[in-house]
């Protein structure tokens, strides 16, 4: 039987793709993309011309049977995100879970993840916990933060629209008992890191906040 490949792709710099990922994308019959327009940038760069179809959080349930029919008819299918590893704050969990129930072969082709790269840069200690995206609502977000344990480094992806308020929430909940490291646009031209107190980081960000951010914070023992 054919199989489903879960393929990691670059998070910014197209040169970060692995040889194995390229080999896989070149040999499969179909590629499921979070956004076909975004994926075409990578695929065109490496002259990969395969049938594409969208697979994202708004259609992942409805596309499951289509993917399974392709595989059961003998076609290999690769799943890729706009950037990084599928499943990590991106679609893929449901596909993998349901494929296992059907005993469909799965193979993961590893790639870059922003959270692991950011953690390495942070110099914060193990253990760490990846939170994905915190709640969009300030009240619920603060409740999430209050449940976290001290002595652990936490990693979160943060929208530029929620960044300042999230930093303020950290300060309100933890006061001086939190260390913060913020990085933006990892592997891209304007990659930049922000360190210091929360107030200092907010000042460094200024009024024009652009790009994709990864936030790491370490809760110190009170």
Curated annotation (Swiss-Prot):
EC number in record: 2.1.1.198
Main location: cytoplasm
InterPro entries, per the entry: 4pyrrol_Mease, 4pyrrol_Methylase_sf, 4pyrrole_Mease_sub1, 4pyrrole_Mease_sub2, rRNA_ssu_MeTfrase_I, SAM_MeTrfase_RsmI_CS
Top-level EC class: transferase
Domain of life: Bacteria
Catalysed reactions, as listed in the record: cytidine(1402) in 16S rRNA + S-adenosyl-L-methionine = 2'-O-methylcytidine(1402) in 16S rRNA + S-adenosyl-L-homocysteine + H(+)
Keyword set includes S-adenosyl-L-methionine: yes
This protein's UniProt keywords: Cytoplasm, Methyltransferase, rRNA processing, S-adenosyl-L-methionine, Transferase
Any one GO molecular function term: rRNA (cytosine-2'-O-)-methyltransferase activity
Subcellular localization: Cytoplasm
Pfam families: TP_methylase (PF00590)
A cellular-component GO term for this protein: cytoplasm
Biological function: Catalyzes the 2'-O-methylation of the ribose of cytidine 1402 (C1402) in 16S rRNA.
Family: Belongs to the methyltransferase superfamily. RsmI family.
Designated name of the protein: Ribosomal RNA small subunit methyltransferase I
Gene transcribed to yield this protein: rsmI
């Amino acid at each position: 039987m054919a199989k489903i490949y879960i393929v990691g792709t670059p998070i910014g710099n197209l040169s970060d793709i692995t040889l194995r990922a390229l080999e896989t994308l070149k040999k499969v019959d179909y590629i499921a993309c979070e956004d076909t327009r975004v994926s075409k940038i990578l695929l065109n760069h490496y002259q990969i011309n395969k049938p594409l179809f969208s697979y994202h959080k708004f259609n992942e349930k409805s596309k499951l049977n289509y993917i399974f029919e392709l595989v059961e008819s003998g076609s290999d299918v690769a799943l890729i995100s706009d950037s990084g590893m599928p499943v990590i704050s991106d679609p893929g969990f449901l596909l993998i879970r349901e494929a296992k129930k059907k005993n469909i072969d799965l193979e993961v082709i590893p790639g870059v993840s922003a959270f692991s790269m950011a953690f390495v840069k942070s110099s914060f200690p193990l253990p760490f916990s990846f939170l994905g995206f915190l709640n969009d609502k300030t009240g619920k977000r603060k409740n999430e933060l209050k449940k976290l344990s001290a002595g652990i480094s936490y990693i979160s992806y943060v929208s530029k629209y929620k960044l300042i308020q999230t930093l303020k929430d950290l300060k309100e909940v933890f006061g001086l008992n939190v260390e913060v490291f913020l990085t933006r646009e990892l592997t891209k031209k304007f990659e930049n890191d922000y360190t210091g107190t929360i107030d200092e980081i907010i000042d460094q960000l200024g009024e024009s906040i652009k790009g994709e951010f990864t936030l790491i914070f370490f809760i110190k023992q009170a």
